[in-house]
């Protein structure tokens, strides 16, 4: 396996710059996931690594070799797409070995590689079937097998699970994670689904508008986001954002904020660089960090809109004022109220986040 390094990578279409100076290092054997909303540039960046898109400026190296102008077939990469792209008239065995046959590899070596990949992917019993006789998950495993037999330095996955139903996506996430451990492969993976990113990645690259917002381990991004975009994108359900204003400062960098929708709900938070009195800020609270009424550092009242019961966990959708919705996660079937009920929850300063007017985290 090889490391991948991107140095000030940029991509423009005419005067429109879509990738804006990306710097990133993917270590050998690392599983890195590009995640972000549609149009953020994640697939374009992946295609630039693959050689399917030209690099306008910057430097791309794979295994220490500059690859900017190297033909895609000579970059030592294998790519798995959202569409399986299997040949319908070929069997699983023939599909997996096609690229090797096309390259003129010896028949016995092709057979050895195909059989080894089939064993890893548990496709042994399906080798003589054609794609129409396979499920969606099986077809995707064949597509992955076709990449494995090439023994690439780097695997590139472009939203490979998007065409699968929810149950199959969960199953294939487990399969891909297992595959990464077995092969110790360098993988760069693109998805819009932050759950995929959280469950698969060693390192997540959060993108927006062609720039990298933050890079880090999944739980590091969840626990310590740099800005409101990352805080809201990583985590499901998303973080609650409550507009507030700074109403007081104290020694030691502590500030007291009051929620705009509920001025009586006030919270004192310690900050290394405290904002000034009167500054507009936003308090961030994850759904699972709301506490039972009467506990925490302050209380917040809201009116229930909807309660979703998911077995042992419930999600309460409520509003503090019209148009300002919050989501409360409740465990152990705590009573979440019914439509129109007024409920109270506690908020702890230790589990709350503070953001300035630009959306940047105040630490």
Curated annotation (Swiss-Prot):
Pfam families (UniProt xref): ABC_tran, OB_MalK
Membrane topology: Peripheral membrane protein
Keywords recorded for this protein, A-Z: ATP-binding, Cell inner membrane, Cell membrane, Membrane, Nucleotide-binding, Sugar transport, Transport
Primary location class: membrane
Residue span, ABC transporter domain: 4-234
Molecular function terms from GO: ABC-type maltose transporter activity; ATP binding; ATP hydrolysis activity
Residues reported in the UniProt entry to bind ATP: 36-43
Superkingdom of the source species: Bacteria
GO CC terms in record: ATP-binding cassette (ABC) transporter complex, substrate-binding subunit-containing; maltose transport complex
SMART domains: AAA
Subcellular location: Cell inner membrane
Function: Part of the binding-protein-dependent transport system for lactose. Probably responsible for energy coupling to the transport system.
Annotated protein name in UniProt: Lactose transport ATP-binding protein LacK
Organism of origin: Rhizobium radiobacter
Lineage: Bacteria, Pseudomonadati, Pseudomonadota, Alphaproteobacteria, Hyphomicrobiales
């Amino acid at each position: 396996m090889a490391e991948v390094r991107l140095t000030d990578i940029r991509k423009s279409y005419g005067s429109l710059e879509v990738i804006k100076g990306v710097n990133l290092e993917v270590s050998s054997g690392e599983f890195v996931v590009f995640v972000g909303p549609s149009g953020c540039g994640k697939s374009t960046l992946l295609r630039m690594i693959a050689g399917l898109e030209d690099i306008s400026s910057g430097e791309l190296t794979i295994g220490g070799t500059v690859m900017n102008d190297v033909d895609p077939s000579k970059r030592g990469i294998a790519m798995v797409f959202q569409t399986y792209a299997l040949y319908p008239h070929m069997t699983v065995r023939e599909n997996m070995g096609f690229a090797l046959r096309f390259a003129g590899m010896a028949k016995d070596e092709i057979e050895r590689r195909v059989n080894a990949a089939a064993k890893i992917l548990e496709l042994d019993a399906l080798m003589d079937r054609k794609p129409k006789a396979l499920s969606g998950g099986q077809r995707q495993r064949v597509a992955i097998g076709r990449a494995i037999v090439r023994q690439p330095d780097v695997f590139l996955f472009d939203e490979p699970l998007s065409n699968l139903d929810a149950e199959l996506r969960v199953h294939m996430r487990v399969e891909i994670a297992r595959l990464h451990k077995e092969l110790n492969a360098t993988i760069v993976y693109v998805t819009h689904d932050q759950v995929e990113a959280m469950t698969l990645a060693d390192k997540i690259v959060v993108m927006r508008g062609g720039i990298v917002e933050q890079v880090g381990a999944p739980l590091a991004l969840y626990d310590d986001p740099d800005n409101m975009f990352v805080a809201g994108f990583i985590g499901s359900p998303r973080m609650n954002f409550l507009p507030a204003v700074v109403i007081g400062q104290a020694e030691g960098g502590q500030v007291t904020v009051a929620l705009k929708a509920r001025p009586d709900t006030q919270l004192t938070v310690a900050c290394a660089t405290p904002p000034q009195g009167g500054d507009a800020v936003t308090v961030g609270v994850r759904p699972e960090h709301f506490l039972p009424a009467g506990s925490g550092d302050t209380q917040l009242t809201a009116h229930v809109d909807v309660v979703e019961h998911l077995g042992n966990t419930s999600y309460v959708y409520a509003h503090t004022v019209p148009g300002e919705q919050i989501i409360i996660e409740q465990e152990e079937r705590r009573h979440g109220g019914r439509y129109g009920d007024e409920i109270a929850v506690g908020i702890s300063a230790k589990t709350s986040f503070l953001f300035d007017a630009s959306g940047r985290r105040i630490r």
